Design a protein with these regions (language model features):
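Short, Lys/Arg-rich, polar N-terminal cytosolic tail immediately upstream
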Residues: 1-18
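Interfacial segments of alpha-helical transmembrane regions
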Residues: 19-26, 92-105, 154-165
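Alpha-helical transmembrane segments of multi-pass membrane proteins
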Residues: 30-48
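Interfacial helix-start motif at the membrane-water boundary
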Residues: 56-75
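Internal transmembrane alpha-helix with an interfacial aromatic "cap," most often the third helix
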Residues: 71-98, 102, 143-153
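Small-polar-interrupted transmembrane alpha-helices in polytopic inner-membrane proteins
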Residues: 99-115, 167-175
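Membrane-proximal helix-loop-helix units in multi-pass membrane proteins
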Residues: 109-151
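Terminal transmembrane helical module of multi-pass membrane proteins
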Residues: 150-205
Length: 205
């Protein structure tokens, strides 16, 4: 009786762990991170969340604290990817699931890199490259997971949502880079910081 009951007891425990990883890493974690950089921007003298990038908070007063929070946030995103992989075993086929999860993990690792290598002049190139990798991998994850989910009738709405998120993210990324690039028509408005925050919330939603 005990041998027959053991396997059945392991799966619910594993599913519960996966749900906690998904909840903390993909639910609580994004909200906490948005609140953290919003509060950090409000309390820093002379900082404008409308004009300046979120990365600017990782340099200067309390910069190390914000960088630590950013790294923790990225690690929890990787934890979410693990939980997602476990929970989607009966929904996505192995190919779609592992390709999507791999992209989510790459996104998390890239954001760990942006937290360790800040926007300071000495490390800004690494920071910028890691940011691009994070954006591309997230858009890739949206696309792959969306294509996998639309193949399942019960999950088709979520798949469509994910594919729409890919297009919205691409549009926001293009507008944000346009806003931060000197000489463009949008540059004088100095709304790059605001657009980056819109992009951040959209990607975490």
């Amino acid at each position: 009786m005990q041998k027959n009951g053991a396997p059945g007891s392991v799966k619910p425990r594993g599913d519960q762990t996966a749900r906690w990883l998904a909840l903390i890493g993909g639910g609580i974690n994004p909200i906490a991170f948005v609140l953290a950089y919003t509060l950090a921007g409000l309390v820093r003298p002379g900082y404008s969340p409308i004009h300046q990038a979120i990365s600017d908070l990782g340099v200067g007063p309390n910069g190390s604290l914000m960088d630590t929070i950013a790294v923790l946030h990225a690690l929890l995103l990787i934890a979410f990817a693990v939980g997602f992989a476990l929970l989607m075993r009966g929904v996505l086929t192995a190919g779609w699931r592992w390709f999507g999860v791999a992209l989510l993990v790459v996104r998390g690792l890239a954001q760990v890199t942006t937290g360790l290598f800040t926007d300071a002049p000495a490390t800004v190139r690494i920071h910028s490259l890691a940011t691009i990798v994070a954006l591309l991998s997230m858009m890739g994850a949206f696309t792959v997971i969306g294509l996998g989910l639309v193949r399942t009738p019960q999950w088709r709405a979520w798949g469509t949502y994910s594919l729409v998120a890919t297009l919205v993210t691409l549009l926001l990324v293009a507008i944000e880079f346009w806003a931060f690039r000197p000489g463009t028509p949008l540059a004088p408005a100095r709304v790059g910081g605001l657009l980056e925050r819109v992009l951040s919330v959209e990607m975490l939603a």
